[in-house]
Amino acid sequence: MPKYVLRLTHPPDQCPTANAKTRKILVEGASAIPELAEKLKIKFLAGPLILGTEHDGIAVVEADSVETVQEFILQSGLVQWNSVRVSSARTLPEAIEEMKRVPPPLY
């Protein structure tokens, strides 16, 4: 199943440690994440993890498609106070196998 890395970032004034509205959204919404993920058939491989005091978060998920991941981001409300980057990811063995389909090296 395809893997995706989600990188979330927000400005300090939107951080749940500083903003009462986003704090409420986070506290109330966090418990709904597993149920929403199950509904959309998304499996968390790592995270969600909060990266210290950097105003960033990260998660690694498996999902049928990037559109499913985007739907999760929308329905969870994460997009309301985070900028979210979604990148496809491969294991190292998968990436090595994929290189066989790349044209010969340029250098």
Regions from the PLM with identified roles:
Residues 1-55, 64-68, 94-107:
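Short S/T/G/P-rich N-terminal loop/turn motif that feeds into the first structured element of a domain
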Residues 63-94:
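An amphipathic, aromatic/His-enriched active-site/gating alpha helix that lines ligand/cofactor pockets
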